[in-house]
Design a protein with these regions (language model features):
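Hydrophobic ligand-binding cavity/cleft-lining segments
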Residues: 2-34, 38, 42-50, 73-81, ...
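Glycine-rich portal/gate segments that line the openings of hydrophobic small-molecule binding cavities
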Residues: 4-9, 22-70, 100-104, 186-259, ...
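Membrane-interface elements of multi-pass transporters and channels
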Residues: 27, 31, 54, 58-62, ...
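Membrane-embedded alpha-helical segments of integral membrane proteins
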Residues: 64-115
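Conserved short-loop catalytic and cofactor-binding motifs
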Residues: 94, 152, 248, 293
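A conserved amphipathic terminal alpha-helix motif
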Residues: 97-123, 254, 260-261, 273, ...
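Intrinsic-disorder/low-complexity, polar/charged segments enriched in Ser/Thr/Lys/Arg/Asp/Glu/Gln
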Residues: 148-156, 205, 215, 228, ...
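A short, structured loop/turn motif at beta-sheet edges
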Residues: 157-162, 221-228, 263-274, 310-315
Length: 315
């Protein structure tokens, strides 16, 4: 036991320091930056993979198991700590996981290559810890671009346009046994509950209600009975939940719903093709990464909602 402590003692200290460094950056940069910052999503994970290895000896650095396992252990413990103290929710950590684990490992391999071949003083690598605090203010000076993305989902329904139309203009309360909750619902994405409309015409206001009290305020911008309906979407700020993910995304000026539309197309076999299209806007310097997750989550949501409409219309 004493030999193990002597052999891995410094490495364990390095892991603890790495976790502490990760928590420090999370507190300094705040929740608004975690999903929208180049520094937080790409630079910090790389450094986090290096920090514990600064306390490893050359024999430990030569072990590829250590180069992979130590950064992963550091990141995993860092994530677990943030989850337990309520800094992040599971869905946030899922989104962060790819860059943190991959870049942490890459950083560790780069450190191994430099340290073993060049025998650089490990003290010099400590300056790496300052890089995020120098880059983040510079990143803030660069205006974040805003891009709009579109998601399309379709379903073929054996029902009349009238029956389908009645199930999309207004949505009666959706029972739990009607909506098949998926992975994303279980980790924090609210499921739809109902939708009401004050006037079934152009300019009418539609209210989309979700689990947990979240409400979408929707204004009808196109209305063609039994053919097409479009509406803008705004999140009611009073309905945004206090959980970390909603505050990150819906109150962070990072993700914004733009509009949605339903389009019905008659098919030659008497069935109807129903298309649900949604547009959303991302404003960050890593819109490509936000789009990756935005598309996955919205596609899952739309497909599940269309399944409810299909089932109700075919009764």
């Amino acid at each position: 036991m004493t030999q193990l402590r002597q052999k891995y003692g410094l490495l364990i200290i390095g892991i603890v320091i790495g976790i502490g460094y990760g928590l420090l950056t999370r507190f300094v940069f705040g929740e608004s930056a975690t999903l929208a910052s180049i520094t937080y999503l790409f630079i910090i994970p790389t450094i986090l993979g290096v920090v514990p290895l600064m306390f490893a000896d050359n024999d430990q650095l030569k072990s590829y198991k250590n180069i992979i396992f130590i950064p992963w252990l550091t990141v995993s413990t860092f994530f677990l700590t943030m989850f337990l103290v309520g800094l992040e929710e599971f869905i946030c950590l899922l989104i962060l996981a790819g860059p943190f684990f991959i870049l942490g490992t890459i950083g560790a391999f780069i450190f191994q290559l430099i340290q073993i071949n060049k025998q650089k003083s490990k003290g010099k690598f400590l300056t790496l810890l300052l890089i995020p605090f120098l880059l983040a203010p510079l990143e803030e000076l660069i205006k974040s671009p805003s891009l709009i993305f579109k998601i399309d989902s379709e379903v073929i329904i054996s029902a009349t346009p009238e029956e389908i139309w009645n199930n999309i203009i207004e949505v009666k309360p959706i029972r739990k046994d009607e909506y098949y909750s998926g992975f994303f619902n279980r980790i924090g994405i609210p499921r739809p509950i109902s939708a009401t409309v004050d006037k079934k015409q152009l300019g009418g206001q539609r209210m989309g209600n979700f689990e947990g009290g979240l409400t979408f305020i929707e204004k009808i911008t196109r209305y063609e009975p039994r053919k097409m309906v479009s509406f803008t979407i705004k999140v009611d700020p009073k309905s945004v939940r206090e959980n970390v993910f909603d505050q990150h995304v819906l109150n962070g000026n990072y993700f914004t719903f733009v509009n949605a539309s339903y389009e019905l197309t008659d098919m030659s076999d008497g069935r109807v093709k129903l298309r649900l299209s949604s547009k959303y806007q991302l404003t960050s310097k890593i819109n490509f990464y936000g789009k990756f997750w935005g598309d996955i989550i919205l596609m899952d949501f739309q497909n599940r909602l269309l399944k409810v409409i299909e089932t109700r219309s075919e009764r």
